């Protein structure tokens, strides 16, 4: 089953506010404008109260692409049949004037419709004689009229194509619908616009959303920009999004991650006799897990929230330790053993952290309470301080492979920028023992290029417009949105490809 998708909350709140509202959705071909329009009907809970006019795509094509639409929304394509009606509750002064001009042979291209004086008022109804030149708009008006006083959502995909079909400028059609539907009858209207960039039509709608497809590090990046929403506060105007699974999902940077009560880690088993799991199944699928005797590098931007880094190392440490194996850890940001214990011990049985984890700290940070788990870094000889035989001696009951999880921002702050050049003994020992080495670096780190040169797998994590993205440099992958699910009581990575 495809993912449910998600429209930015500001757009949903905009349409849910009292009164009528209009929104222009624009962007180049392939950016998801039709998907956005159709999905909006579902997220507003108004699928049955929506009228979709497709001027470019046949109903059959829509149903093939959006299977969930069938039996829920009946699109209306361009029509040739003529319809009439005896009375209408929906305001239609501007439409009647436009039809009148068409019947007189005029183009109907004035920017603003003139007031009309024809028609007869009967109670709360305005009865006028209909023209028969605009059957698609007539059908939309009749749909809305049949549901008054309830609100409906009318979607026109696209207003450019409808204008071409009629020989009427799109601006004129928007003005007519704005006056009749939005202002006169308090209905919601969405116009799909095929052009991108700033246009004079932007001034005619209450809101404007643009969709764009660009590149980030040679990978596809999709960006949704809320250019305006009249009367609606916009806290975050730009979202990354994906069309994965045929749905538009905007990644919410303000997403409320609610941790459940901490639970014991459920170990992810080895992928093979030569590869342990990272504890992060989506990453295992990309890189094939942690190959024994080899190096994995994570290049993590300083713009990435610290929680994301902590959940990443929590998953790796817990998955190794929960299987009775050993961990030697240099925390990022010159972190302490005490903080590492607080981070991961709630996901382990009592005593397992002390038995299977050793944390390297700068000598000045050593605490007596953590003397059993702390290994000191004196700051002069990194190969001696991180000597692998000492780690093995400290973890006599732990099974193999061990995990060496080392943050190079801390190592560089203790030993200097050339620290990695002095760690040949550590890398050689890990390789001989068939253990696994994971290094964290930042893009600015002097060790980044050298570590990535040693690594068989390189992941890069960054923050783009407030959303955290991940991609593989080795092996080469597309761009993913990275989020975390804590509902199970421990951190679980969720990757969504940006396609």
Language-model features: locations:
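P-loop NTPase motor core
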Residues: 126-203, 208, 377-454
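Glycine-rich P-loop/Walker A and Walker A-like loops and their local beta1-loop-alpha1 context
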Residues: 6-11, 16-46, 277-337
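Short glycine-/polar-rich loops that comprise or flank the Walker A/P-loop
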Residues: 20, 46-49, 186-187, 203-207, ...
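Conserved inter-motif catalytic segment of the P-loop NTP-binding fold
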Residues: 49-162, 325-413
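Hydrophobic/aromatic beta-strand patches that form the interior of the parallel beta-sheet core
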Residues: 23-25, 51-53, 190, 207-211, ...
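Phosphate-binding and hydrolysis-coupling loops of NTP-dependent motor/remodeling domains
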Residues: 206-281, 459-499
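Conserved nucleotide-binding/hydrolysis micro-motifs of P-loop NTPases
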Residues: 31, 56-60, 160-161, 195-198, ...
């Amino acid at each position: 089953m495809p993912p449910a998708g998600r429209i930015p909350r500001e757009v949903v709140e905009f349409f849910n506010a009292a009164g009528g509202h209009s929104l222009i959705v624009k962007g180049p071909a392939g950016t998801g404008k039709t998907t956005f329009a159709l999905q909006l009907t579902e997220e507003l809970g108004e699928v049955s109260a929506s009228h979709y006019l497709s001027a470019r795509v046949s109903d059959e094509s829509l149903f093939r692409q959006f299977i969930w639409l069938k039996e829920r929304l009946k699109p209306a394509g361009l029509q040739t049949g003529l319809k009439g009606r005896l009375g209408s509750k929906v305001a239609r002064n501007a439409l009647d004037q436009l039809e009148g001009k068409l019947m007189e042979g005029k183009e109907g291209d004035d920017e603003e419709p003139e007031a009309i004086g024809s028609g007869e008022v009967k109670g709360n109804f305005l009865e006028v004689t209909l023209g028969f030149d605009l059957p698609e708009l007539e059908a939309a008006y009749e749909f809305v009229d049949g549901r008054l006083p309830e609100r409906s959502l009318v979607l026109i995909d696209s207003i450019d194509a409808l204008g071409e079909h009629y020989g009427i400028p799109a601006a004129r059609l928007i003005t007519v619908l704005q006056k009749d539907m939005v202002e006169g009858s308090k209905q919601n209207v969405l116009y799909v616009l095929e052009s991108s960039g700033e246009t004079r039509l932007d001034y005619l709608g209450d809101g404007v959303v643009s969709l764009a497809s660009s590149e980030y590090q040679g990978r596809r990046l999709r960006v949704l920009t809320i250019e305006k929403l009249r009367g609606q506060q916009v806290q975050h105007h730009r979202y990354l999004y994906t069309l994965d699974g045929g749905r538009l999902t905007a990644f919410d940077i303000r997403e409320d991650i609610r941790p459940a009560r901490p639970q014991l880690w459920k170990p992810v088993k080895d992928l093979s006799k030569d590869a342990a799991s990272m504890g992060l199944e989506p990453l295992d699928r990309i890189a094939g897990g942690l190959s024994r005797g080899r190096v994995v590098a994570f290049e993590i931007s300083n713009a990435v929230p610290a929680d994301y880094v902590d959940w990443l190392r929590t998953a790796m440490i817990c998955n190794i330790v929960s299987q009775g194996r050993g961990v030697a850890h240099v925390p990022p940001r010159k972190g302490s053993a005490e903080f590492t214990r607080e981070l991961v011990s709630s996901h382990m049985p009592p005593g397992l952290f002390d038995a299977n984890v050793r944390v390297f700290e700068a000598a000045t940070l050593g605490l007596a309470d953590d003397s059993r788990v702390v290994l000191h870094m004196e700051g002069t000889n990194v190969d001696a301080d991180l000597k692998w035989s000492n780690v093995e001696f400290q973890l006599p009951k732990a099974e193999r492979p061990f995990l060496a999880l080392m943050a190079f921002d801390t190592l560089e702050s203790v030993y200097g920028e050339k620290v990695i050049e002095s760690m040949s003994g550590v890398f050689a020992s890990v390789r001989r023992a068939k253990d696994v080495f994971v290094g964290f670096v930042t893009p600015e780190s002097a060790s980044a290029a050298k570590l990535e040169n040693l690594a068989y797998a390189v992941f890069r994590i960054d923050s783009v417009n407030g959303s955290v993205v991940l991609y593989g440099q080795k092996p080469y992958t597309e761009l993913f949105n990275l989020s975390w699910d804590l509902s199970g009581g421990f951190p679980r990575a969720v990757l969504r490809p940006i396609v």
